[in-house]
């Protein structure tokens, strides 16, 4: 069983938008009421109140206007405060005490799974709204066949409404062909967003840089207006829409690239980059934030779990760029302006990012072989390039699973192929007698 969610934009009219705004207001009121009530009881020296007690007290003093919104959204808002308070006391350094929600805070409310209904692939029936609301894109087939957990309606910074459908489904469907089981190492960078060990790359569109002048202009215009005036709000609305476009453009690019990588490879290796530390370099901070390294890692993690791909991480201090993939020699210095890696030991000339991606994949394979078979013999026998070449020749169709070349495998089928691949790779490594270094 896999738990996931789908976020879809709602196409609403002014009447529906007003009803959604009212539901958000009720949820915000319930959250603030729970916070104020908890503070009042604590100040009076009363015992700690539970979530159930807060809900019961809130329901006893409901007024007429509250019944115009779903009861579950207000109950969940109270529960959200209790959970936020619990997180604060468990880890006060990371989570501050929950603040009151203001009108300008992010607007959202929760809907229980039995209070809303998916009418068809492009319409959904929400509580207290007479007609079904149209969706901007169709609901996924696995969402229709799976079990709905809950719904969350929210308003984005671009003034558009979205619904997130959380659901669980049984992963028994075929996902990919047996010929799509390669190996790839990924080197993330500023000039090229993702350089693959196969020689392919994902270009960095530099979306922030392209719109920097326009965003700066909007910020200057806002600074010259009276705060919260009509003109200020109009400019801020345009500024938020442009920021939303940039965010969605970057997310769409990374979604498409990571899906293709995970679908076509059974082993993916990446560097565990310290993004926060990299951002401390003020000369590169803007360019690094434009890349979305953290988003790439998050997307690869959950998509690897979905498709049965093995995601391997290499330590952040591994010198992937300075190391020669041909002989293993490590350079003392390598400036950012050097786009080609030239090895003084073996004479290898290769693109520096491709060289780094090969080293990332080889190091990940070295670590995984050591973890599975408790020996580091592969590192003594093979150079990074030789191990990657051997592993690539062994990847593909499993010898132990009885499926023909045109049969489609499920997520569990690929996991079997990954285990079989490492067993075959270890047999080749153990039988190798020639030291390649």
Locate the predicted segments by residue:
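Acidic carboxylate diad motif detector
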Residues: 51-157
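Metal-dependent catalytic core segments for phosphate chemistry
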Residues: 192-237
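A short acidic-Thr-Gly-centered motif at the start of a beta-strand
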Residues: 1, 161-184, 341-342
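Gly/Thr-rich phosphate-binding beta-strand-loop-beta motif of the actin/hexokinase/Hsp70
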Residues: 12, 179-197, 300, 353
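Short glycine-rich phosphate-binding loop at a beta-alpha junction
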Residues: 261, 266-272, 312
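Gly/serine-rich nucleotide phosphate-binding loop at the start of the catalytic core
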Residues: 1-76, 436
């Amino acid at each position: 069983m896999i738990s996931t969610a789908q976020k879809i934009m709602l196409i609403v009219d002014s009447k529906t938008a007003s009803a959604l705004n009212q539901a958000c207001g009720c949820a915000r009121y319930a959250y603030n009421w729970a916070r104020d009530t908890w503070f009042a009881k604590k100040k009076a020296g009363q015992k700690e109140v539970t979530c159930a007690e807060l809900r019961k007290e809130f329901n006893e003093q409901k007024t007429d206007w509250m019944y115009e919104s779903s009861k579950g959204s207000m109950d969940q808002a109270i529960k959200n405060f209790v959970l936020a308070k619990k997180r604060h006391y468990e880890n006060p350094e990371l989570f501050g005490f929950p603040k009151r929600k203001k009108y300008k805070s992010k607007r959202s409310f929760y809907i229980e799974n039995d209070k809303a209904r998916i009418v068809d692939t492009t319409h959904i029936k929400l509580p207290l709204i007479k007609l079904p609301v149209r969706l901007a894109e169709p609901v996924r087939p696995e969402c229709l066949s799976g079990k709905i957990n809950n719904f969350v309606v929210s308003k984005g910074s671009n003034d558009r409404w979205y619904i997130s459908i959380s659901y669980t489904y049984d992963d028994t469907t075929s996902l990919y062909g047996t010929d799509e089981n390669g190996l790839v190492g990924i080197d993330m960078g500023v000039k090229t967003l993702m350089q693959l060990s196969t020689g392919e790359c994902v270009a960095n569109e530099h979306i922030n840089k392209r719109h920097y002048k326009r965003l700066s202009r909007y910020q200057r215009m806002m600074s010259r207006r009276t705060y919260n005036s009509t003109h200020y709000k109009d400019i801020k609305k345009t500024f938020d829409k442009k920021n939303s476009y940039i965010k969605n453009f970057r997310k769409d690019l990374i979604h498409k690239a990571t899906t293709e990588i995970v679908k076509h490879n059974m082993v993916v290796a990446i560097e565990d980059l310290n993004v926060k530390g990299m951002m401390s370099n003020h000369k590169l901070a803007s360019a690094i934030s434009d890349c979305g390294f953290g988003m790439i890692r998050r997307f690869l993690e959950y998509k690897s779990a979905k498709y049965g791909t093995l995601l391997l991480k290499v330590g952040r201090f591994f010198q992937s760029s300075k190391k020669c993939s041909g002989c293993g020699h490590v350079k003392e210095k390598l400036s950012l302006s050097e786009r080609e890696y030239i090895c003084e030991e073996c004479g290898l000339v290769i693109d520096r990012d491709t060289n780094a991606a090969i080293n990332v994949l080889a190091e990940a394979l070295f670590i995984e072989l050591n973890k599975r078979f408790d020996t580091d013999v592969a590192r003594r026998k093979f150079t990074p390039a030789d191990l990657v070449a051997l592993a690539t020749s062994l990847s593909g169709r499993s010898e132990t699973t009885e499926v023909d070349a045109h049969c489609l495998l499920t997520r569990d089928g690929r996991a079997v192929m990954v285990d079989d691949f490492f067993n075959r790779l270890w047999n080749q490594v153990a039988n190798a007698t020639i030291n390649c270094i």
